[in-house]
């Protein structure tokens, strides 16, 4: 059993050493594109035209 543990330790040690010493490449941050101009405008007023079309029924 002791020999098995030693064998596992010897096999895992190079992986640990390589994992700790290798440097990961970091990609540059890409700026997102600016939003289109129509997104920055205020929303259209749909309430006023709809009030002229849809009105509550008259009480009679």
Swiss-Prot record:
Source organism, top-level taxon: Bacteria
Lipid moiety-binding residues (N-palmitoyl cysteine): 20
Gene Ontology, cellular component aspect: cell outer membrane
Keywords from the UniProt entry: Cell outer membrane, Cytolysis, Disulfide bond, Host cell lysis by virus, Lipoprotein, Membrane, Palmitate, Signal, Viral release from host cell
Leftover remarks: Encoded by the cryptic lambdoid prophage DLP12.
Quaternary organization: Homodimer; disulfide-linked. Interacts (via C-terminus) with RZ (via C-terminus). Part of the spanin complex which spans the entire periplasmic space. The spanin complex is composed of spanin, inner membrane subunit and spanin, outer membrane subunit.
Function per UniProt: Component of the spanin complex that disrupts the outer membrane and causes cell lysis during virus exit. The spanin complex conducts the final step in cell lysis by disrupting the outer membrane after holin and endolysin action have permeabilized the inner membrane and degraded the host peptidoglycans.
Descriptive protein name: Prophage outer membrane lipoprotein RzoD
UniProt gene name: rzoD
